Swiss-Prot record:
<keyword id="KW-0808">Transferase</keyword>
<dbReference type="InterPro" id="IPR042081">
    <property type="entry name" value="RNA_2'-PTrans_C"/>
</dbReference>
<comment type="function">
    <text>Removes the 2'-phosphate from RNA via an intermediate in which the phosphate is ADP-ribosylated by NAD followed by a presumed transesterification to release the RNA and generate ADP-ribose 1''-2''-cyclic phosphate (APPR&gt;P). May function as an ADP-ribosylase.</text>
</comment>
<comment type="similarity">
    <text>Belongs to the KptA/TPT1 family.</text>
</comment>
<dbReference type="GO" id="GO:0000215">
    <property type="term" value="F:tRNA 2'-phosphotransferase activity"/>
</dbReference>
<dbReference type="GO" id="GO:0006388">
    <property type="term" value="P:tRNA splicing, via endonucleolytic cleavage and ligation"/>
</dbReference>
<dbReference type="InterPro" id="IPR002745">
    <property type="entry name" value="Ptrans_KptA/Tpt1"/>
</dbReference>
<keyword id="KW-0520">NAD</keyword>
<protein>
    <recommendedName>
        <fullName>Probable RNA 2'-phosphotransferase</fullName>
        <ecNumber>2.7.1.-</ecNumber>
    </recommendedName>
</protein>
<dbReference type="InterPro" id="IPR022928">
    <property type="entry name" value="RNA_2'-PTrans_KptA"/>
</dbReference>
<dbReference type="GO" id="GO:0003950">
    <property type="term" value="F:NAD+ poly-ADP-ribosyltransferase activity"/>
</dbReference>
<dbReference type="InterPro" id="IPR042080">
    <property type="entry name" value="RNA_2'-PTrans_N"/>
</dbReference>
<dbReference type="Pfam" id="PF01885">
    <property type="entry name" value="PTS_2-RNA"/>
</dbReference>
Amino acid sequence: MNKKQRDEISKLLSYLLRHAPESMGLTLDRDGWSEVDDLIRKANAHGYAFDRQALNEVVETNEKKRFTLSEDDQRIRAAQGHSTVQVQVQHAEKEPPATLYHGTASRFMTSIETQGLIAGSRHHVHLTEDPETAMSVGKRYGQPVLLAVDAKGMFEAGVRFFQADNGIWLVKAVSRDSLTVLRLPIPE
């Protein structure tokens, strides 16, 4: 399978497992799990031709580790990023490292400077331990801006942090007082 085919399947999985399972009649449980065979059968019926081997390849090669297979390989879910109300994944609550990072685009900075980071249509704000990963996320939306998050201070103030299956840190919101701009976009 080539990269284009893997990317197409990955985008479909993200759409179904994070945002719109009902678009193909897929059912997710409260923790976001879907039966692998059911997902493949319904995707095939909607014109997406792939099998379990292709799905496994997408899961294994996805750089951001967006998907998780159950221990018995019978179920699949998105690691994080759900916007569907029926999914309320119970991620492990953990103490975060002192500093986490968030990548955004410069066009969102006015809003962030006013209200901090909010989850929007998702259940959580996504943070990472790696500044380069954060910058690559910011690049997807325009001129990237790197923000440092005072995770230690937030945690000590009682804010709950969770860690998804793929290592991404999740929090309900980040106040503007807990943010520091580390890298602004380079003017062209």
